[in-house]
Amino acid sequence: MFSLLLGVLYILTPTVWGDISQRATLANNLVSNGTGTPYSMNVTDCPGYTLGSLQESDTGLTAHLTLAGPACNAFGLDISDLTIEVTYQSQSTLHVKIYDTANQQFTIPESVIERPAAPTTSYAGNSDLIFNYDATPFAFWITRRSDPGAMPLFDTRTSSLPPTPIPPFNASDASTAFDGFPLVFEDQYLQVASALPYGTNIYGLGEVIASSGFRRDIGTNGGVGTIQTHWSLGVSDPIDQNLYGSHPIYLEHRYNTTTGKASASGVLLLSSAGSDIFLQTPPNSKVSLIEYRMIGGILDFYFFSGPSDAEVIAQYGSVIGYPMWQPAWGFGFHLCRWGYHNVSDDRENVAQMRAAGIPLEVQWNDIDLYHAYRDFTTDPVSFPGDEVREFIQELAANHQHYIPIVDAAIAVTRNSTDVYDPFTRGVEEDVWIKNPDGSLYIAEVWPGYTVFPDWFSENMLSVWTDSLKNWSDMGVEFSGIWLDMNEPSTFCSYSCGTGANFSSVGPLTDVSSVVIGYPECYNETLWGPSGNMTVNGTSTYSCAANSTTMTLVEKRGVGAGREEGADLNNPPYAIHNAAGSLNQHSLASNATYSGGYVDLDVHNMFGLMEEKATHLAIQSILPEKRPFLISRSTFPSAGKWTGHWLGDNFSKWQYLYLNIQGVLQFQIYQIPMVGADTCGFNGNADEELCNRWMQLSAFTPFYRNHNTNGALPQEPYRWDSVANASRIAIAARYAMLPYWYTLFANSSMAGIPPVRALFYEFPDEPELFTVDKQWLVGSDILVTPVLTPGASTVEGIFPGRGSVMWRDWYTHAVVNATGQSTTLDAPISHINVHIRDNSALLLHQVPGYTIYETREGPYSLLVSLNAAGTAFGTAYVDDGISFPPGPSRSLTFQAAEGTLVIDSNGEYEIVQMLETITVLGVQKPTQVAIQGSPIEGWTYKEATEELVVSNTSVGLNGQTTLVWR
């Protein structure tokens, strides 16, 4: 076929464009009420299904589900014949899949997300979980084998759910009513609900910035409940709206008030369909509920037994894939802004960071780098290729790295003389998304008119890889890639460029005006634009004393506008998309991919598919090195390919706090390399906010300072106090790198979350279930940041209710805490960090300016004994860069009864010596020996019960014993 573009006749590769959706052939298999449209828009009369033709096997069961009565056609056409497959996937994982027997509904292809292989061992008789069902009407519930009499983990029986009808919990939005809880399976609408324990603890179901905090609002204790919409949307970090990614998994932490014990479980609905997920507790109800409302696809559930929170997360990882291996340099400090206008700006920034003694590992560039905002280009004046190459090689010579941005949209050439190979090569290879008629889908983004990659095209990976490689060959010798705008985001509705005169539209003009707006408690009209904490010796703080108010920013009202008609762009059920219509700020839902897939079905996976392609491309371009990738839009299994930053946040104190719940969320989603734009992206940061934020982010996995064009500079060297805070925090971070690296190795090998909510480690302490102003790095490092302006102290809770000793990271003093809220000193430039007892941490003794320099230096070991005098820890060591990971060495540290034993196993040879061993919680010894030989080089500090053994020069490739008596 032909498409007239830009005055040039492009011959498109012939493609068979049949039905624009897999559902188009459903009509012959659907039950119709004979009225066509409109649909009933109500599930009250939906009949549910009846189970029959049951076949059991060693690994589960298969059965047919038949519509139990006249079709209701609530928001689509009822599908009369379904199949249910139940598979005991492993000891801890149960898979329940309900799909149309004709296999016409969209199902996520294995090429996008590889599923676990069919089990070869029978778990049906000893699985942690049991599948129970009623045949008529069909319903199912999941129980624990160990406690079959307890309330089920998931229960779809209407008798277990609150009685209906339930009026709207938002009076202005009729769709927030619950008319009934039948199983509904239609071509454009699926619904299933489960009872939950009253007021139980639910986490996940993102991506979201929830006003309720890390724990989701389930409609009890004064809450209004939750509508979590899953439709990837490129918006600037609003609260209680759908965001960049879709992760329909939740973690339930269920506490038994009778026994005082808690257990965790998890539920994944593996679906890319747009959806609303409701969490609610109706008035006077004794149970809460979760309801899924989907606009396509199938019901593909995985249930995880836990019983610990970390085990649930790991079990989820075993299904969708464990996180990618991170290069060691990725844990360094990254610096970026939209507004580094040329290579000289980059060079000046790097020089200023070094002059201030603030470690800089990675320099980034935003879209300033591009020529006419086109991917895979550099501006010939501001960023000429040879100069960019020279700059990047200067970084590399100092063991530093460089990362550029890649937007999802690809510019369309404007006329016959316009040369842009990524676009024209893509046309030749037929790799761009199309309209239903086969013409190119053309939207508008930064470069002007643009096309979008069709990740289902068999040629897409080679075009993408070549574009990245050519860019690197031109001078942009990247170490990693930053993927942005990949929900995907557009600046117009539908295919607005189809048939347009491309030569009349150039790149969009970026924001060039000065950004206004400062953090709470800074009055720029009174104190000027510096953002300093003091001006002429006077404090600029302007809030009421001890104010801790957190105001909501743009909290949405529920109820997306419903457009009449039932087509792909406007499904009969209108999910609560923050932008309204599904095509707003993104592709139209009938945008068509290879194989006939439409955006309605695959929209939420666009970012994932780009991440996979980019990861594979980097592997090809930088062989034998671990790719480093940070992306905005994510979906289940994205962590195999990328890390994530929390999007376009604000330079506000509230967003400093919201940073924490985002990091905790993405540990659940198996995307542990995550962090926020430190000091905030939108608006101007001030000195105090940036001081506190640089400290906080030093204890999150991904550590990058980034802000918007036109805003005041916020690099950490801009204020003396921020520079000081940064040096202190980064020194602590780099000292802890062996610990961070071990946590991430465990994540890549077994799915264990590196960053943890407090209750993960202390599951039976209900006072911790809502704590999201503190967090744990691993099991042993407790972080308590300042989150409000004008503070010199901070309140924190120390888990363990007095049974655990927590020692200050800096002084090693024991905190006098009993599990209640404790007031800690927190002067400016200080963040409270505490070490758990019964721990042993391998550290870098001398943090260097770069990760390379730090890793080249000696190790130290910090042992924090508990009251019984024991401690335990592990470390994983390898070269930090090879892919696939090469030889490694596993270390264990175990202390008891005055003896520390270091065991070492593996093939990797650790060259650096262990030079210092510090043991906390010991009585003053009279003799210290290593390998049975008494030594003299030790000191003791009475106040902290601290034994320091210096200049040990112990190798870490064999067993070592330290004894104190």
Language-model features, listed with the residues they occupy:
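Fungal secretory targeting signals
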Residues: 1-20
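Catalytic-domain carbohydrate-binding cleft regions of carbohydrate-active enzymes
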Residues: 19-56, 60, 154-829, 836
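A low-complexity, Ser/Thr/Gly/Pro-enriched, surface-exposed linker/loop concept
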Residues: 28-69, 78-126
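Accessory, solvent-exposed terminal regions and/or long lumenal/extracellular loops of proteins
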Residues: 33-44, 51, 60, 835-933, ...
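Short, well-ordered beta-strand segments enriched in hydrophobic/aromatic residues
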Residues: 63-65, 86, 96-98, 128, ...
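Beta-strand-rich binding/interaction modules
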Residues: 82, 792-811, 912-931
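Hydrophobic or amphipathic alpha-helical targeting/insertion segments
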Residues: 123-171
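Extracellular/luminal ectodomains and secreted, surface-exposed scaffolds of diverse proteins
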Residues: 931-957
